Amino acid sequence: MALNIENIIAEIKEASILELNDLVKAIEEEFGVTAAAPVAAAAAGGAEEAAKDSFDVELTSAGDKKVGVIKAVREITGLGLKEAKGLVDGAPANVKEGVAAAEAEEIKAKLEEAGATITLK
């Protein structure tokens, strides 16, 4: 198994920036994750003692009205149908990260109206 990992690392080292960007996008789509999530969490960890001026909107549960929640997620994020469905199916997941308090409340209200359970972090 170590040999396979070494081959993957060697391929990544040889790839161009554009190829690496495409790889990251493909991984995000395939696994329903975002590359920005760990970076935002690390940055927020050190600033928690300061006044909280940005929030992550987390979809905790889609509830019974999953189709309505998918539509709301698409409207809010601009994601395609497949990506929005993947995000909703993968709950809990962040819908938006690092948004202002007012925008976070608006997003929360829209998603809760659609039937979702939302947590602001």
Curated annotation (Swiss-Prot):
Pfam families (alphabetical): Ribosomal_L12, Ribosomal_L12_N
GO molecular function: mRNA binding; structural constituent of ribosome
UniProt keywords, alphabetically: Ribonucleoprotein, Ribosomal protein
Coiled coil: none
Gene Ontology terms: cellular component: cytosolic large ribosomal subunit
NCBIfam families per the UniProt record, alphabetical: L12
Stated family: Belongs to the bacterial ribosomal protein bL12 family.
Function: Forms part of the ribosomal stalk which helps the ribosome interact with GTP-bound translation factors. Is thus essential for accurate translation.
Protein name: Large ribosomal subunit protein bL12
Native source species: Streptococcus pyogenes serotype M1
Lineage of source species: Bacteria, Bacillati, Bacillota, Bacilli, Lactobacillales
Gene: rplL
